[in-house]
Amino acid sequence: MNEYNFSDIEKSTQEYWRKNDTFKTIEDNTKEKFYCLSMLPYPSGTLHMGHVRNYTIGDVIARYQKMQGKNVLHPMGWDAFGLPAENAAIKHKKSPYEWTKSNIAYMRSQFDSLGFSFDWSREITTCDEDYYKWEQWFFIQLYKKGLAYRKNSVVNWDPVDQTVLANEQVVDGRGWRSGALVEKKEIPQWFLKITDYADELLQDINKLDNWPEAVKTMQINWIGKSKGLTVKFKVKDSNQEIEVFTTRPDTLMGVNYLGIAPEHPLALKEAKSNSQLAAFIEECKKTSTMEADLATQEKKGFKTSIKVIHPISAETIDVWVANFVLMGYGSGAVMSVPAHDQRDWEFAQKYNIPLKQVIESNDNKLKIDLEKQAFTEKGILINSGEFDGLNFKNAYQAIKKYLTEQNKGYETTNFRIHDWGISRQRYWGCPIPMIHCDDCGAVPEKEENLPVRLPTDVALTEAGSPLKDIPEFINVACPECGKPAKRETDTFDTFFESSWYYARYTCPTANQMLDQEANYWLPVDKYIGGIEHAIMHLLYARFFHKLMRDQGLVKSDEPFKNLLTQGMVLKDGAKMSKSKGNIVDPQELIDKYGADTVRLFSMFAAPPEQSLEWSETGVEGANKFLRKVFNYAELNKVIFAKNITLESQKLTKEDKKARFEIHSNLKQAIFDFDKSQFNTVVSACMKILNTLNNYDNLSESVKVEGFSILLRILAPFTPHLCHYLWQQLNLGEDILHTSFPTVDNNALEKDEFLLVVQINGKLKAKLELDASLSSNQVEEVVLADEHVKSFIDNKQVVKVIYVPQKLINIVIK
């Protein structure tokens, strides 16, 4: 008997796929389309187990859908721009392009060795000119519409990577890649007006029926829509006003001070003549701007000489510069009510600012102790003049009416989300296609001159971008007036590239951004990736899709119908990482056990959404199962050569039992496939093989039927072995182009059933009975059974409880 030689099987199968262009996909309107996509990787150089799991999930889905008769698009590409490549290139004294292309070549060979069914004819590399040319073109269209703009902005500055970070890229006050403490800095930045789409992005979350609730909740919270009042506080002895937004106008009469951001114009003006304030502002620049950090870090402030007038009471109120107020949120100012806001209370305690209670509880029995903490619940207004006695709802309306009539405020809908800062001050990115002219201002590059190519002959350093030091890149003629001008040296945030790549896969060689194929394939039917992308990539991609729709490039509203967020791969309870020394190299596993074993383990060890705990024993178990599958084929290959057909009238009792088990497991596998519960699909395969091995006298036709069902269920998981055995057993040419098995409902109709017999609730017997018996007949047969009679002779049968074809309980006394 031949041994399971996974190496030869996998090489020959992969060669077959290559020769036959098995995975190449074309538009076919006669078939239902299915677009299956896993998030494209950054070409780091080698695959890790997280990659293996993520892309195996996608491959299993793609292969299953293909066997369902659908026209499946399953592409792959590379998120190739960004700081890691630039930093690696500096370290290894190579160009980022060389470094990236070398990594791609190796990782692609690893993908192929795992048997992934990618259509490589659609491969995209985001650092290629043919790709980024079209995002430059798209940016220009957005600029012409007023959806892209440039302004001075206080940004999160990473002093190590020498670039700006979006708020989402600051983790615990540190840069998400470098780990450096982030600083605040004001520089010119390019932005996209994602706020123009905030309402639609929020509302359309309701369309995402097949997205995890956790991701939808994260996006809802990030967009952060809230309704409230903008209140105007007049600066004393000045014509200026400070506007603040509040969702709690019922607390307006309890305002004890205003807090303004360290970068607020009034703060900066006073700092010119106040060195202590200037020093405080400098200190604030070194603190985190992330909301999570602001909530936990020490509250610090500096009392200014600025006073404002309360819009209702006309009281004079102090203005403090506070480290927890952000210039990028609203107007950079907040009204502070220490009695009814815990953060304001903590600040007031530190600086001995008095409290004024203006809300009391609806519950008269509740004692409010402002010495211990703020009272933050809604209730009844007190100490609020004409508004005393009002509840929140009525107070909101009354105060809104007063402020509006007095021109001292207005109702506002506010969003937590802010426009997306897309400028990065590094080299290895897509050049922003803008030119700065002293006379004309910012001018887009002429479309016929696109792409604006990234220079390749550059001297890379760790101190920012070298583009500003390349005269032939910077010095250009203004596209409008022809006078000498300067090219923009910022590059796009790499999330710009990954926000539309899924659409370009549909037409990767089109001489336009997208063509008609985009509307055939989009939206993506199944998107697979980590939940860590919930509020960056997934939100930006939704935004881009709506921008492309409004540009007439796509017809759908949303990019991804169904989202699967896979869990992490853990070892010893921790995420695999070099720093923890718990990395498992997939290539070593492939060399030792074969790609099919690695794939099978990664799908069987846990449901896709849950974390997978690495286990060498689990890998060995997966390999052992595949050897059993191979050995069964070897032992029975003579049978398959006979071309036997199943004849139901000739089936034995054992055949029928086996077919019931096989088709029951097939039915469960189909259900679990559609739910993406792949671990239980693999379990069904194991049960089918056990059935085939456990019955000694199965008909050859049942063996052939059962094993062909097993191979087709297993094929999406272990494509090499199943392809090989399918051909070896003369079942067909290519299992991938074979229809997925269907359940024979006749096989699920039992001739007999096993009945559990209880007497007074205790198990006494198990009887095999004819399935055609009625309830009365079952009762007669059971009561007449000699073994049962031995328990009930000379006893009174009080009643008989029968659960059809499962259990009968005889109550006696």
Swiss-Prot record:
What biological-process terms (Gene Ontology) are attached?
leucyl-tRNA aminoacylation
What reaction gets catalysed by this protein? tRNA(Leu) + L-leucine + ATP = L-leucyl-tRNA(Leu) + AMP + diphosphate
UniProt entry tagged with the keyword Calcium: no
Q: Which GO terms describe its molecular function?
A: aminoacyl-tRNA deacylase activity; ATP binding; leucine-tRNA ligase activity
Cellular compartments annotated: Cytoplasm
Q: What is its EC number?
A: 6.1.1.4
Name it: Leucine--tRNA ligase
Give the domain of life: Bacteria
Q: What is its main location?
A: cytoplasm
Q: Where is this motif: 'KMSKS' region?
A: 575-579
Q: Where is this motif: 'HIGH' region?
A: 41-51
Query: What keywords are annotated for this sequence in UniProt?
Result: Aminoacyl-tRNA synthetase, ATP-binding, Cytoplasm, Ligase, Nucleotide-binding, Protein biosynthesis
Q: Which GO terms describe its cellular component?
A: cytosol
Q: Does the keyword Aminoacyl-tRNA synthetase apply?
A: yes
Name the positions where ATP binds.
Answer: K578
- Which family, according to the similarity comment? Belongs to the class-I aminoacyl-tRNA synthetase family.
Q: Which Pfam families match?
A: Anticodon_1, tRNA-synt_1, tRNA-synt_1_2, tRNA-synt_1g
